Amino acid sequence: MAAARISFSSTSRTSYYRHSPFLGPKPTPTTPSVYPITPFSPNLGSILRCRRRPSFTVCFVLEDDKFKTQFEAGEEDIEMKIEEQISATRLAEKLARKKSERFTYLVAAVMSSFGITSMAVMAVYYRFYWQMEGGEVPFSEMFGTFALSVGAAVGMEFWARWAHKALWHASLWHMHESHHKPREGPFELNDVFAIINAVPAIALLDYGFFHKGLIPGLCFGAGLGITVFGMAYMFVHDGLVHKRFPVGPVANVPYLRKVAAAHSLHHSEKFNGVPYGLFLGPKELEEVGGLEELEKEVNRRTRYIKGS
Protein backbone atom coordinates (compact mmCIF):
# COMPACT_ATOMS: atom_id res chain seq x y z
CA MET A 1 0.00 0.00 0.00
CA ALA A 2 1.36 3.39 -0.97
CA ALA A 3 0.76 6.73 0.65
CA ALA A 4 0.59 9.87 -1.53
CA ARG A 5 1.93 13.29 -0.77
CA ILE A 6 0.88 16.30 -2.88
CA SER A 7 3.09 19.34 -3.43
CA PHE A 8 2.35 22.45 -5.44
CA SER A 9 4.84 24.62 -7.26
CA SER A 10 4.05 27.89 -8.95
CA THR A 11 5.75 29.01 -12.18
CA SER A 12 5.12 31.78 -14.66
CA ARG A 13 4.96 31.59 -18.43
CA THR A 14 5.00 34.46 -20.92
CA SER A 15 2.30 34.38 -23.65
CA TYR A 16 2.40 36.56 -26.75
CA TYR A 17 -0.84 37.32 -28.59
CA ARG A 18 -0.92 38.79 -32.09
CA HIS A 19 -3.79 38.94 -34.53
CA SER A 20 -2.95 37.63 -37.95
CA PRO A 21 -4.71 39.24 -41.00
CA PHE A 22 -5.03 35.85 -42.58
CA LEU A 23 -7.26 34.53 -39.83
CA GLY A 24 -10.10 36.97 -40.43
CA PRO A 25 -11.12 40.33 -39.07
CA LYS A 26 -10.01 41.68 -35.80
CA PRO A 27 -12.35 41.20 -32.92
CA THR A 28 -12.97 44.96 -32.80
CA PRO A 29 -15.75 45.63 -35.33
CA THR A 30 -15.75 49.45 -35.22
CA THR A 31 -12.49 50.52 -36.76
CA PRO A 32 -10.97 48.01 -39.09
CA SER A 33 -7.30 48.53 -39.78
CA VAL A 34 -6.13 48.76 -43.40
CA TYR A 35 -2.52 49.50 -42.65
CA PRO A 36 0.02 46.78 -42.28
CA ILE A 37 1.62 46.39 -38.99
CA THR A 38 4.88 48.23 -38.72
CA PRO A 39 7.17 48.99 -35.85
CA PHE A 40 5.81 52.53 -35.89
CA SER A 41 2.20 51.49 -35.68
CA PRO A 42 0.32 53.28 -32.86
CA ASN A 43 -1.48 50.07 -31.92
CA LEU A 44 1.67 48.04 -31.57
CA GLY A 45 1.40 48.16 -27.79
CA SER A 46 -2.08 46.72 -27.88
CA ILE A 47 -1.22 44.10 -30.45
CA LEU A 48 1.90 42.88 -28.78
CA ARG A 49 0.92 42.38 -25.29
CA CYS A 50 2.78 40.44 -22.67
CA ARG A 51 0.71 38.71 -20.02
CA ARG A 52 2.00 36.46 -17.30
CA ARG A 53 -0.24 33.63 -16.22
CA PRO A 54 0.44 31.67 -13.04
CA SER A 55 0.94 27.97 -13.69
CA PHE A 56 0.63 25.25 -11.05
CA THR A 57 2.47 21.95 -11.12
CA VAL A 58 1.17 19.11 -8.95
CA CYS A 59 3.79 16.60 -7.82
CA PHE A 60 2.87 13.28 -6.28
CA VAL A 61 5.44 11.77 -3.93
CA LEU A 62 4.65 8.15 -3.15
CA GLU A 63 5.83 6.31 -0.07
CA ASP A 64 5.94 2.57 -0.60
CA ASP A 65 4.85 0.94 2.66
CA LYS A 66 5.80 -2.43 1.23
CA PHE A 67 9.37 -1.28 0.71
CA LYS A 68 9.39 0.19 4.21
CA THR A 69 8.11 -3.11 5.63
CA GLN A 70 10.77 -5.03 3.72
CA PHE A 71 13.44 -2.70 5.04
CA GLU A 72 12.24 -3.13 8.61
CA ALA A 73 12.09 -6.91 8.12
CA GLY A 74 15.65 -6.81 6.84
CA GLU A 75 16.74 -4.96 9.97
CA GLU A 76 14.98 -7.55 12.11
CA ASP A 77 16.74 -10.37 10.25
CA ILE A 78 20.10 -8.73 10.86
CA GLU A 79 19.31 -8.30 14.55
CA MET A 80 18.19 -11.94 14.79
CA LYS A 81 21.40 -13.12 13.12
CA ILE A 82 23.47 -11.05 15.54
CA GLU A 83 21.52 -12.47 18.48
CA GLU A 84 21.98 -16.00 17.12
CA GLN A 85 25.72 -15.43 16.82
CA ILE A 86 25.85 -14.10 20.38
CA SER A 87 23.79 -17.06 21.61
CA ALA A 88 26.03 -19.49 19.76
CA THR A 89 29.11 -17.87 21.29
CA ARG A 90 27.62 -18.02 24.77
CA LEU A 91 26.59 -21.65 24.23
CA ALA A 92 30.10 -22.54 23.09
CA GLU A 93 31.57 -20.81 26.13
CA LYS A 94 29.11 -22.61 28.42
CA LEU A 95 29.92 -26.00 26.89
CA ALA A 96 33.64 -25.32 27.19
CA ARG A 97 33.19 -24.30 30.82
CA LYS A 98 31.13 -27.42 31.55
CA LYS A 99 33.74 -29.57 29.86
CA SER A 100 36.47 -27.99 31.95
CA GLU A 101 34.43 -28.47 35.13
CA ARG A 102 33.78 -32.14 34.33
CA PHE A 103 37.47 -32.70 33.63
CA THR A 104 38.46 -31.02 36.89
CA TYR A 105 36.03 -33.12 38.90
CA LEU A 106 37.07 -36.25 37.01
CA VAL A 107 40.71 -35.67 37.92
CA ALA A 108 39.77 -35.12 41.56
CA ALA A 109 37.52 -38.20 41.58
CA VAL A 110 40.12 -40.43 39.94
CA MET A 111 42.91 -39.27 42.23
CA SER A 112 40.82 -39.69 45.37
CA SER A 113 39.41 -43.02 44.21
CA PHE A 114 42.78 -44.37 43.20
CA GLY A 115 44.39 -43.17 46.41
CA ILE A 116 41.70 -44.54 48.73
CA THR A 117 41.31 -47.80 46.80
CA SER A 118 45.03 -48.47 46.67
CA MET A 119 45.42 -47.73 50.38
CA ALA A 120 42.46 -49.96 51.24
CA VAL A 121 43.81 -52.86 49.16
CA MET A 122 47.29 -52.53 50.62
CA ALA A 123 45.85 -52.27 54.13
CA VAL A 124 43.81 -55.46 53.67
CA TYR A 125 46.78 -57.35 52.23
CA TYR A 126 49.30 -56.34 54.89
CA ARG A 127 46.86 -56.76 57.75
CA PHE A 128 46.10 -60.38 56.90
CA TYR A 129 49.74 -60.97 56.06
CA TRP A 130 50.80 -59.85 59.56
CA GLN A 131 47.99 -61.86 61.15
CA MET A 132 49.29 -65.08 59.58
CA GLU A 133 52.95 -64.53 60.38
CA GLY A 134 52.87 -67.02 63.25
CA GLY A 135 51.43 -69.75 61.05
CA GLU A 136 47.94 -69.55 62.52
CA VAL A 137 44.99 -68.32 60.47
CA PRO A 138 42.63 -66.12 62.56
CA PHE A 139 39.39 -67.28 60.94
CA SER A 140 37.14 -65.51 63.41
CA GLU A 141 38.91 -62.21 62.89
CA MET A 142 38.88 -62.59 59.13
CA PHE A 143 35.19 -63.49 59.12
CA GLY A 144 34.41 -60.53 61.35
CA THR A 145 36.29 -58.22 59.00
CA PHE A 146 34.44 -59.56 55.96
CA ALA A 147 31.04 -59.48 57.70
CA LEU A 148 31.50 -55.92 58.91
CA SER A 149 32.62 -54.86 55.45
CA VAL A 150 29.35 -56.04 53.89
CA GLY A 151 27.27 -54.91 56.85
CA ALA A 152 28.77 -51.43 56.90
CA ALA A 153 28.24 -51.02 53.15
CA VAL A 154 24.56 -52.00 53.45
CA GLY A 155 24.12 -50.01 56.64
CA MET A 156 25.47 -46.89 54.97
CA GLU A 157 22.53 -46.98 52.55
CA PHE A 158 20.08 -46.75 55.45
CA TRP A 159 22.24 -44.16 57.20
CA ALA A 160 22.37 -42.07 54.03
CA ARG A 161 18.58 -42.33 53.63
CA TRP A 162 17.94 -41.17 57.19
CA ALA A 163 20.57 -38.43 57.13
CA HIS A 164 19.34 -37.22 53.75
CA LYS A 165 15.79 -36.74 55.02
CA ALA A 166 16.31 -35.83 58.69
CA LEU A 167 19.47 -33.72 58.35
CA TRP A 168 20.29 -32.64 54.82
CA HIS A 169 16.73 -31.56 54.00
CA ALA A 170 16.27 -30.04 57.46
CA SER A 171 18.93 -28.41 59.63
CA LEU A 172 21.71 -28.86 57.05
CA TRP A 173 19.68 -27.63 54.10
CA HIS A 174 21.88 -24.54 53.75
CA MET A 175 24.67 -26.89 52.69
CA HIS A 176 22.65 -29.47 50.79
CA GLU A 177 20.74 -26.80 48.86
CA SER A 178 23.74 -26.35 46.56
CA HIS A 179 23.06 -29.86 45.24
CA HIS A 180 19.51 -28.92 44.18
CA LYS A 181 20.59 -25.80 42.28
CA PRO A 182 22.51 -25.42 39.01
CA ARG A 183 26.15 -25.99 39.83
CA GLU A 184 28.63 -23.17 39.29
CA GLY A 185 32.11 -24.58 39.03
CA PRO A 186 33.39 -28.14 39.36
CA PHE A 187 32.47 -28.47 43.04
CA GLU A 188 29.54 -27.66 45.31
CA LEU A 189 29.11 -27.15 49.03
CA ASN A 190 27.28 -30.48 49.27
CA ASP A 191 30.59 -32.26 48.53
CA VAL A 192 31.60 -31.53 52.11
CA PHE A 193 29.37 -34.42 53.22
CA ALA A 194 31.63 -36.85 51.36
CA ILE A 195 34.60 -35.61 53.38
CA ILE A 196 32.60 -35.83 56.60
CA ASN A 197 31.71 -39.46 55.90
CA ALA A 198 35.34 -40.23 55.03
CA VAL A 199 36.58 -39.19 58.49
CA PRO A 200 35.11 -42.16 60.46
CA ALA A 201 36.12 -44.56 57.67
CA ILE A 202 39.76 -43.47 57.88
CA ALA A 203 39.71 -43.60 61.69
CA LEU A 204 38.30 -47.15 61.72
CA LEU A 205 40.78 -48.35 59.09
CA ASP A 206 43.67 -46.80 60.99
CA TYR A 207 42.73 -48.42 64.27
CA GLY A 208 42.07 -51.82 62.71
CA PHE A 209 45.27 -51.77 60.67
CA PHE A 210 47.67 -51.08 63.53
CA HIS A 211 46.05 -53.40 66.08
CA LYS A 212 45.39 -57.12 66.27
CA GLY A 213 42.37 -58.90 67.66
CA LEU A 214 38.68 -59.33 66.97
CA ILE A 215 37.62 -55.78 67.81
CA PRO A 216 40.30 -54.17 65.62
CA GLY A 217 39.30 -56.62 62.88
CA LEU A 218 35.68 -55.54 63.15
CA CYS A 219 36.68 -51.88 63.08
CA PHE A 220 38.84 -52.50 60.03
CA GLY A 221 35.92 -54.19 58.27
CA ALA A 222 33.55 -51.36 59.13
CA GLY A 223 35.95 -48.77 57.75
CA LEU A 224 36.41 -50.86 54.62
CA GLY A 225 32.63 -51.14 54.12
CA ILE A 226 32.14 -47.39 54.46
CA THR A 227 34.91 -46.85 51.91
CA VAL A 228 33.37 -49.27 49.40
CA PHE A 229 29.95 -47.63 49.78
CA GLY A 230 31.47 -44.18 49.28
CA MET A 231 33.18 -45.29 46.08
CA ALA A 232 30.00 -46.85 44.70
CA TYR A 233 27.95 -43.82 45.72
CA MET A 234 30.31 -41.46 43.92
CA PHE A 235 30.26 -43.44 40.67
CA VAL A 236 26.48 -43.91 40.59
CA HIS A 237 25.34 -40.60 42.11
CA ASP A 238 27.91 -38.16 40.76
CA GLY A 239 28.81 -39.98 37.56
CA LEU A 240 25.72 -41.84 36.36
CA VAL A 241 22.94 -39.61 37.73
CA HIS A 242 24.43 -36.10 37.59
CA LYS A 243 26.98 -36.79 34.83
CA ARG A 244 29.84 -35.03 36.57
CA PHE A 245 32.19 -37.48 34.85
CA PRO A 246 31.79 -40.38 32.39
CA VAL A 247 31.14 -43.80 33.91
CA GLY A 248 31.46 -46.02 30.83
CA PRO A 249 29.72 -49.42 30.96
CA VAL A 250 28.26 -48.69 34.40
CA ALA A 251 25.48 -46.79 32.61
CA ASN A 252 24.36 -49.99 30.84
CA VAL A 253 23.54 -51.93 34.02
CA PRO A 254 19.70 -52.21 34.09
CA TYR A 255 19.27 -51.91 37.86
CA LEU A 256 21.61 -48.93 38.04
CA ARG A 257 19.47 -47.25 35.38
CA LYS A 258 16.52 -47.62 37.73
CA VAL A 259 18.60 -46.23 40.57
CA ALA A 260 19.54 -43.19 38.48
CA ALA A 261 15.93 -42.64 37.40
CA ALA A 262 14.71 -42.92 40.99
CA HIS A 263 17.18 -40.28 42.15
CA SER A 264 16.06 -38.01 39.30
CA LEU A 265 12.52 -38.27 40.69
CA HIS A 266 13.90 -37.21 44.07
CA HIS A 267 15.10 -33.97 42.49
CA SER A 268 11.73 -33.48 40.77
CA GLU A 269 9.98 -33.73 44.18
CA LYS A 270 6.98 -35.50 42.63
CA PHE A 271 6.65 -37.71 45.71
CA ASN A 272 7.63 -35.16 48.38
CA GLY A 273 11.33 -35.92 48.00
CA VAL A 274 11.03 -39.72 47.96
CA PRO A 275 13.34 -41.55 47.49
CA TYR A 276 15.91 -40.25 49.94
CA GLY A 277 18.13 -43.29 49.60
CA LEU A 278 20.17 -44.16 46.52
CA PHE A 279 20.64 -47.86 45.85
CA LEU A 280 17.26 -48.80 47.37
CA GLY A 281 15.51 -45.84 45.77
CA PRO A 282 13.30 -47.99 43.49
CA LYS A 283 12.04 -49.86 46.56
CA GLU A 284 11.09 -46.58 48.23
CA LEU A 285 9.14 -45.50 45.16
CA GLU A 286 7.31 -48.80 45.12
CA GLU A 287 6.13 -48.13 48.67
CA VAL A 288 4.58 -44.79 47.66
CA GLY A 289 3.13 -46.01 44.36
CA GLY A 290 5.69 -44.41 42.08
CA LEU A 291 6.64 -47.37 39.87
CA GLU A 292 4.78 -45.98 36.87
CA GLU A 293 6.64 -42.68 37.05
CA LEU A 294 9.85 -44.62 37.58
CA GLU A 295 9.34 -46.55 34.33
CA LYS A 296 8.62 -43.32 32.46
CA GLU A 297 11.82 -41.78 33.79
CA VAL A 298 13.83 -44.87 32.88
CA ASN A 299 12.49 -44.75 29.31
CA ARG A 300 13.17 -41.04 29.06
CA ARG A 301 16.76 -41.43 30.19
CA THR A 302 17.24 -44.38 27.83
CA ARG A 303 16.02 -42.33 24.85
CA TYR A 304 18.29 -39.47 25.89
CA ILE A 305 21.33 -41.75 26.07
CA LYS A 306 20.56 -43.30 22.68
CA GLY A 307 19.97 -39.88 21.14
CA SER A 308 23.27 -38.52 22.40
Curated annotation (Swiss-Prot):
List membrane-spanning regions.
105-125, 139-159, 191-211, 215-235
| Domain of life assignment | Eukaryota
Q: Which GO terms describe its molecular function?
A: beta-carotene 3-hydroxylase activity; hydrolase activity; metal ion binding
**EC id:** 1.14.15.24
Sequence motif Histidine box-3, location on chain: 237-242
Localization of this protein: Plastid, Chloroplast membrane
GO biological process annotations for this chain's record? carotenoid biosynthetic process
Q: Where is the transit peptide?
A: 1-59
For the protein in the UniProt heading, the enzyme class is oxidoreductase
Chain positions of motif Histidine box-4: 263-267
Notes on activation and inhibition: Inhibited by o-phenanthroline and 8-hydroxyquinoline.
- Residue ranges constituting the Fatty acid hydroxylase domain according to the UniProt record: 152-279
The protein's matches in InterPro entries, at most eight in alphabetical order, are given as: BETA-OHASE-like
Q: Does the keyword Lyase apply?
A: no
Report whether Iron shows up as a keyword of the record. yes
Q: Which reaction does it catalyse?
A: all-trans-beta-carotene + 4 reduced [2Fe-2S]-[ferredoxin] + 2 O2 + 4 H(+) = all-trans-zeaxanthin + 4 oxidized [2Fe-2S]-[ferredoxin] + 2 H2O; all-trans-beta-carotene + 2 reduced [2Fe-2S]-[ferredoxin] + O2 + 2 H(+) = beta-cryptoxanthin + 2 oxidized [2Fe-2S]-[ferredoxin] + H2O; beta-cryptoxanthin + 2 reduced [2Fe-2S]-[ferredoxin] + O2 + 2 H(+) = all-trans-zeaxanthin + 2 oxidized [2Fe-2S]-[ferredoxin] + H2O
Question: Which keywords does the record carry?
Answer: Carotenoid biosynthesis, Chloroplast, Hydrolase, Iron, Membrane, Metal-binding, NAD, Oxidoreductase, Plastid, Transit peptide, Transmembrane, Transmembrane helix
Q: Where does this chain carry the motif Histidine box-2?
A: 176-180
GO cellular component terms?
chloroplast membrane
Query: What is the stated purpose of this protein?
Result: Nonheme diiron monooxygenase involved in the biosynthesis of xanthophylls. Specific for beta-ring hydroxylations of beta-carotene. Produces beta-cryptoxanthin and zeaxanthin. Uses ferredoxin as an electron donor.
State the family it belongs to.
Belongs to the sterol desaturase family.
Q: Which PANTHER family does the entry mention?
A: BETA-CAROTENE 3-HYDROXYLASE 1, CHLOROPLASTIC, BETA-CAROTENE HYDROXYLASE 2, CHLOROPLASTIC
Q: Could you give the domain comment from the record? A: The histidine box domains may contain the active site and/or be involved in iron binding.
| Protein name per Swiss-Prot or TrEMBL | Beta-carotene hydroxylase 2, chloroplastic
> From what organism does this protein derive?
Capsicum annuum
